[in-house]
Amino acid sequence: MPSMLGSMMVASTSAPSLQEALENAGRLIDRQLQEDRMYPDLSELLMVSAPNSPTVSGMSDMDYPLQGPGLLSVPSLPEISTIRRVPLRLSWLNSLDTCSVTAMMGVFPPISRAWLTIDSDIFMWNYEDGGDLAYFDGLSETILAVGLVKPKAGIFQPHVRHLLVLATPVDIVILGLSYANVQTGSGILNDSVCGGLQLLPDPLYSLPTDNTYLLTITSTDNGRIFLAGKDGCLYEVAYQAEAGWFSQRCRKINHSKSSLSFLVPSLLQFTFSEDDPIVQIEIDNSRNILYTRSEKGVIQVYDLGHDGQGMSRVASVSQNAIVCAAGNIARTIDRSVFKPIVQIAVIENSESLDCQLLAVTHAGVRLYFSTCPFRQPLARPNTLTLVHVRLPPGFSASSTVEKPSKVHKALYSKGILLMTASENEDNDILWCVNHDTFPFQKPMMETQMTTRVDGHSWALSAIDELKVDKIITPLNKDHIPITDSPVVVQQHMLPPKKFVLLSAQGSLMFHKLRPVDQLRHLLVSNVGGDGEEIERFFKLHQEDQACATCLILACSTAACDREVSAWATRAFFRYGGEAQMRFPATLPTPSNVGPILGSPMYSSSPVPTGSPYPNPSSLGTPSHGAQPPTMSTPMSAVGNPAMQAASLSGLTGPEIVYSGKHNGICIYFSRIMGNIWDASLVVERVFKSSNREITAIESSVPIQLLESVLQELKGLQEFLDRNSQFSGGPLGNPNTTAKVQQRLLGVMRPENGNTQQMQQELQRKFHEAQLSEKISLQAIQQLVRKSYQALALWKLLCEHQFTVIVGELQKEFQEQLKITTFKDLVIREKEVTGALIASLINCYIRDNAAVDGISLHLQDTCPLLYSTDDAVCSKANELLQRSRQVQSKSERERMLRESLKEYQKISNQVDLPSVCAQYRQVRFYEGVVELSLTAAEKKDPQGLGLHFYKHGEPEEDVVGLQTFQERLNSYKCITDTLQELVNQSKAAPQSPSVPKKPGPPVLSSDPNMLSNEEAGHHFEQMLKLAQRSKDELFSIALYNWLIQADLADKLLQIASPFLEPHLVRMAKVDQNRVRYMDLLWRYYEKNRSFSSAARVLSKLADMHSTEISLQQRLEYIARAILSAKSSTAISSIAADGEFLHELEEKMEVARIQLQIQETLQRQYSHHSSVQDAISQLDSELMDITKLYGEFADPFKLAECKLAIIHCAGYSDPILVHTLWQDIIEKELSDSVTLSSSDRMHALSLKLVLLGKIYAGTPRFFPLDFIVQFLEQQVCTLNWDVGFVIQTMNEIGVPLPRLLEVYDQLFKSRDPFWNRVKSPLHLLDCIHVLLTRYVENPSLVLNCERRRFTNLCLDAVCGYLVELQSMSSSVAVQAITGNFKSLQAKLERLH
C-alpha cells in the first residue's frame, strides 16, 4: 500500500508574519543557547593559560565576594541542606567503643550502601534508611581494606552484579554481590531500590597477600582492581574466567616493581629505601589515568592507555617538590599551609580539559595539577605540573572569616569542595566551597559555608547522580562542549547533588543546593514572592538569570509546589524589570534608578560610590559580557524626527533593552530545549541480522528525555498562557509604567527648561520598548506552543514503531530527516511533520486499525500540526484505503464516493496528486475529475485565474498568476490521468512466450494494469465527464492537453461554447499558431462554416512561418478554394465570390513559386545560397515581382521567368524569344553527355510540356522563332530532319500553321543554312511535314483538308521552281524527285 504522505496533512496556511515571528524567536534562542555554551573551562576560571604559567587566587575579596565587609550578603542563602540522619545500630556502637577492635567505615554509592568492618566481619546497610542489612563473617583475619568492583563483562554469571574485595594480612578474598527480586539486565543505576542485597557465601577468588599489608582498594569502570600496599607498592588483581597455559584465574601484580613480582615471595623482595605506604588511589575513568598518594605526600601518575587496559608510570612528585612549587607561586603565603596533603581528587574531562588533578592540604588549600599540555584533550599524561594554588576563605586582607584548619577529609565533585576539619575531639566542621552562583565569572568567584557535624567524620562521599546524556549528532557535534554545563544551566532537569557523611553516630545525608533550591528556601522563609532578601537574590544573579531560575518554580506543575509556584510568579513580575531604552552614558546613572537602569548587564556607567553592592558586572551568574546581543535591539535615530528631537537633549542612538522577564523566558526555554534544539532528528544505526547488516533510522532522543522536556515545556506554556492577560501585553505589568517614566525623568535633566518635550519623548521611547518586547514575547509564546506540540508528536512517533514509520516515508523525506534539527522541525518543516503524521496513520490503516482514535489523539496533542481538516483528510484516506479490501462493487463505490465527499470538504488543502494517484489505482476516475475541479474552484473562488488568462497574463498581476498556476496544477491531475489511460490503450499487448520453468503461470508484476480495451473505455467515460464541466479555464486546459496528446479528432468532437474562442485566441497569441489555426479551420469546416474555414486557410497559406512548407501552402489554398466554393454554393454573398477569385489568383502565383522552388531543388540544391532561397520560398507566399526579381532572374530560371510573365500578362517578344532560347539551350546543355536519340527525346519532352502550356497564347509561344531556333540546332547537331515537326505535332500545332512557318522560313533566305552547308535543310523538313500529311490526311480537319491540299500543291510547285534554279547536284536532284513524287500524291488527294 503506497504511503499517502502529504495527502494526509493539510498544507500550511500560516501567515507569513507568524513564520517570521517564529524565525525571530528561534534566533533569540540560538544566541542564548550559544551563550550558555560559552562557559569557561576550569583553567580559564583559574586564569591559567598554560602549564608553565601557574597562578594563585583566594587572596582577593572578590574571590569569595559574599564574605567581605561591604559586599553583597544574603545571610539566609544556604549552600547545603540536610536530608536525614540515620544512626548506627546500638550493638555496633558498643563494639566500636571497645579499644581492642579494628574498625573501618565507608560508602559504596553505586549500591547505596554504607559499610563497617569490625575485625574480621563486614556489615553493609542502606544508608538511606539503615535497613537491608547484609554481612559476611567468613574470614578469620582482620579486614584491612575493602573495595567494591563492577566486574569485567563476560566472566561471571549475570546475577553477579558487583564484586566485594576484602583484604586481610593473609589473603585477598573476592565475593559476589547480587540482588533479590531484580531481573537481570534491568539497567537500574541503584539496583538496591528494587530488592535486597545478597552476599554470595562462597568466595569467587582467593589469593595470598604474600605478607603485604594492603591499605586501600579501588577499581576502574572496566573492572580492573588496584590495591595500595603499606610497602609503598601499587598492586593489581588480575582475574579471568578460566586458567590458561601461562596464566592463573586470579593473580596479583606489583606495578611498582618487576612485572614478574607475582612469582617472587615478598620475603625475598628487599629494598634499601624506607617504606612510604600508599594511602590513596584515585582513578580518572574519563581519561584512563590512575593517581596514588603516599603517606609522605608523594603523588604518582600512571597511564592506563587509551583503552584502559595498559599500565605505565609516567610521573612522580614528592611533597617537598609540591610545597616548593606552591611557595614559588604564592610567595607571600606561609608554606606550612601547603602540607600535608590530605586528599587528592580527579578532575574529569567533563569538568575541565586542561586540569586533571586536585590536591587538598590540611589547611584547605587546593592545588590544581595538569598532566599534559593544554588544549590537547586526546593527549596522554606525561608529567604532573602544579598550575594553580587556590587559597581557602580567610586569606584576603579584609576577610573576617576563620581559615580552615585540621582538615582530615575532603571530597571534590564537579566544582564542589567539601572538607571536614576537626573542631575538637568530638565534633567536625563541614566546609562547602563552590562556584555554582558564579559559573561564568572570571576569575573564579566562590561561595562558602560551614556547618557543625556531630562526631568525627569517617567517610565522605558523593552519591552517584542522575546524569542526562548529551544528544550529540552529526549536525551539532561541533557546537556541544566536551565539558558539562554549569549547574545553573542544568538545574531545571537535574536534582541537587546528594552527599553522605559517615561518622560513629551514623550517616548524614545532605544536598548541595542549586540556585533554584536557594530561591525556594527564600520564598518559603519569607512566605511570599517579595522581600528584601528575594530582591537581593535577583540582584545577585541579575534579573534575567534570576527570572530564568524563578521560572523553574513558577512553571512547576507538582501539587506540592502550588504555593511556591504562586510566590515565584509574584517575584518574577515584581523583580523582573521592564523593557527600556538604553541611552549613551552622557549622564551618570543616579543611585535612585534601581535595578532597571542600574542593572549590570545594561548599565553604561559605573555603580555610584557608596553603593552597598559591588559592581554587579563582575557578579552576574552568566555574565557573558556587558551587553548581550540577544537581548537588545539597536535603533538608529537617523531620519526619525522624534529621535532627532530627542538628540537635542543628548538622547542619541537609543536601543531597546528587553526586561529580565523577557530574557528569563528566553533563557529558560533555551535551557529546556538546549540538549536537543540543534540536534539531528534521527540517527542511523547498523544492526546485524542473519549475517547481514541492516541500517535503521532511529530517533536521536530517547523517549525518557522527551518526556522530561515535554513536562518542562508544558509548565512554561501554561505559565505563559496564564499570565498573558495583563493589559501591558503578554507578561506585562501595568503598574510599573508610571514608576519607570518617573525614574527616566529622574535620570535626564533637560536644559533650557524643555521638560515637557523631554517627558513626551521619554514616554514615547518607553512605549516603543514595551511594544517591541510585547511582539517578541508573543513570538516566543508561539515558539513554546509549537515546540511543545512538535515534541509531543515526536514522542507519539517514538511510542509507536518509529523505525517502521520512518521507513514508510519516501526516500527524499528520509534523507531530509537526517539533515533536519529539532529547531527546523518546530519552525520550518511543516512538510516533514505532515509526512510523519501521514505515515503514522497509514500504519494504522495498513494494520486494519481504525484511525479515529489516533486522529483524535493527534488533534488533542498537536492541533497546530494536525488540525480538524487534517482529521477529515485522515478519515477520507481511511475510506479510500479500506475500499481496496472490499469485494462488493457497490460497497466499494459507496466508500469511494464517501471518501470523495470528505476530500472535497478540504480539497484546496490536500495533496491532490497523491490522492488522485490512489483514485487511479482503484479506477475511480470520476473522483479524480470531481476532486480536482473542486480543488481548483476552492483555491480560486473569485475566478482570478480566468481573469488573468483572458487579460493576456500580465506580469504585474502576481495574485492572478498564483491562482492561475494553482488552477493549472489541479487540472493537471485530470490530464495526467487521461494521458495514462491513453498510453495504456495504445500499449502493445504482451506476446505469448515459452515459460522459463514448469509450473503455474507467473502473474504480471502489475495486477492493476488495464487492458487496451478497458483503458480506452475508461478514457472515453472520463473525457465525457470532463466535458460537462462549466469551468472555462479547465475546458481550455483540456483542449490544450488534447492537442498536445495528438488527439485533435477528439477535440473537434467536443460541442462547447469555449472551444471556438479558445482556438481563435490561441491562433493569435500562441507561439504554435499554425497548429491552432489548422485546428480552427477544421473546426469551422466540421461545423459547416465554410467561409470562415476558407479565410483561416488563406491566412495559414499567407503566414510567414518556417513550420509550413510551400507544398502545404498550396494545399491550404486549394482547401480554401474548395471551402469558398462551398460557401458560395450555400450563400450568394458578393464578398465570398470576390474572395474566391482572390484565392484562385493566389493559387496561380503559388504554383509558380513552387515551380521555382522545385527547379532550385532539382538543379542547384548543393549550393548554400540556393538552400537559403529554398527555405525562404517555404517561409511565405510571394508576389510575382519578388519571385522574378529575387529568385527567377538571379538564378536564371528561364522556364520560371516565362511562367511569371505569362501569369502577369507581360508581353515582350524579345524577352520571350530569349527565354525560349535559354530554355532550349539549358536543356541541350543538361543532356550533353547523352546520346543523340536521348537528347532529342529529352528536348522533345521539355518542349511538349511547355508547348501544351503556352501554345494557346502565341505571345508566349513564338512558333516562328522556336521552329527556326530548333531547326538550326537540329542542323548543327545533325539530328533527324523530322524531329521538330514531330515535336510540334505532339504539342498540337496545326499542320497548316506549321507549313506556314516553314514556308516563311524558307522564303526568308536566311544565310545560316549556307554557312552550315545545309541549304536544302528546310526543304527536307517541309518534305517530311507534307509526307506526314499525305500519309495521314486526318491530321488536318476534314473541312480544311481540300484548301490545305491546294495550298500544299501551290507550295510544292514553288519549291520545284526554286530547285530548278539551283545548280544541279545529287542532293538537288534527290529532293526534286521527292517533291515530284509528293506532288503526285497530293494531286491524288485533291
Curated annotation (Swiss-Prot):
<keyword id="KW-0653">Protein transport</keyword>
<keyword id="KW-0906">Nuclear pore complex</keyword>
<dbReference type="GO" id="GO:0017056">
    <property type="term" value="F:structural constituent of nuclear pore"/>
</dbReference>
<dbReference type="GO" id="GO:0006406">
    <property type="term" value="P:mRNA export from nucleus"/>
</dbReference>
<comment type="function">
    <text>Essential component of nuclear pore complex. Could be essessential for embryogenesis. Nucleoporins may be involved both in binding and translocating proteins during nucleocytoplasmic transport.</text>
</comment>
<dbReference type="InterPro" id="IPR042533">
    <property type="entry name" value="Nucleoporin_Nup155_C_1"/>
</dbReference>
<protein>
    <recommendedName>
        <fullName>Nuclear pore complex protein Nup155</fullName>
    </recommendedName>
</protein>
<dbReference type="GO" id="GO:0006405">
    <property type="term" value="P:RNA export from nucleus"/>
</dbReference>
<dbReference type="GO" id="GO:0006606">
    <property type="term" value="P:protein import into nucleus"/>
</dbReference>
<dbReference type="GO" id="GO:0000972">
    <property type="term" value="P:transcription-dependent tethering of RNA polymerase II gene DNA at nuclear periphery"/>
</dbReference>
<feature type="cross-link" description="Glycyl lysine isopeptide (Lys-Gly) (interchain with G-Cter in SUMO2)">
    <location>
        <position position="739"/>
    </location>
</feature>
<dbReference type="Pfam" id="PF08801">
    <property type="entry name" value="Nucleoporin_N"/>
</dbReference>
<dbReference type="InterPro" id="IPR042538">
    <property type="entry name" value="Nucleoporin_Nup155_C_3"/>
</dbReference>
<dbReference type="InterPro" id="IPR014908">
    <property type="entry name" value="Nucleoporin_Nup133/Nup155_N"/>
</dbReference>
<dbReference type="InterPro" id="IPR042537">
    <property type="entry name" value="Nucleoporin_Nup155_C_2"/>
</dbReference>
<dbReference type="GO" id="GO:0031965">
    <property type="term" value="C:nuclear membrane"/>
</dbReference>
<dbReference type="Pfam" id="PF03177">
    <property type="entry name" value="Nucleoporin_C"/>
</dbReference>
<dbReference type="GO" id="GO:0036228">
    <property type="term" value="P:protein localization to nuclear inner membrane"/>
</dbReference>
<feature type="modified residue" description="Phosphoserine">
    <location>
        <position position="1056"/>
    </location>
</feature>
<feature type="glycosylation site" description="O-linked (GlcNAc) serine">
    <location>
        <position position="525"/>
    </location>
</feature>
<keyword id="KW-0832">Ubl conjugation</keyword>
<dbReference type="GO" id="GO:0035196">
    <property type="term" value="P:miRNA processing"/>
</dbReference>
<keyword id="KW-0539">Nucleus</keyword>
<feature type="region of interest" description="Disordered">
    <location>
        <begin position="984"/>
        <end position="1011"/>
    </location>
</feature>
<keyword id="KW-0813">Transport</keyword>
<feature type="region of interest" description="Disordered">
    <location>
        <begin position="598"/>
        <end position="632"/>
    </location>
</feature>
<dbReference type="GO" id="GO:0044611">
    <property type="term" value="C:nuclear pore inner ring"/>
</dbReference>
<comment type="subunit">
    <text>Interacts with GLE1. Able to form a heterotrimer with GLE1 and NUP42 in vitro. Forms a complex with NUP35, NUP93, NUP205 and lamin B.</text>
</comment>
<keyword id="KW-0472">Membrane</keyword>
<comment type="similarity">
    <text>Belongs to the non-repetitive/WGA-negative nucleoporin family.</text>
</comment>
<keyword id="KW-0325">Glycoprotein</keyword>
<keyword id="KW-0597">Phosphoprotein</keyword>
<keyword id="KW-0509">mRNA transport</keyword>
<dbReference type="InterPro" id="IPR004870">
    <property type="entry name" value="Nucleoporin_Nup155"/>
</dbReference>
<dbReference type="GO" id="GO:0034504">
    <property type="term" value="P:protein localization to nucleus"/>
</dbReference>
<dbReference type="GO" id="GO:0005635">
    <property type="term" value="C:nuclear envelope"/>
</dbReference>
<keyword id="KW-1015">Disulfide bond</keyword>
<dbReference type="GO" id="GO:0006998">
    <property type="term" value="P:nuclear envelope organization"/>
</dbReference>
<keyword id="KW-0811">Translocation</keyword>
<dbReference type="InterPro" id="IPR007187">
    <property type="entry name" value="Nucleoporin_Nup133/Nup155_C"/>
</dbReference>
<dbReference type="GO" id="GO:0086014">
    <property type="term" value="P:atrial cardiac muscle cell action potential"/>
</dbReference>
<keyword id="KW-1017">Isopeptide bond</keyword>
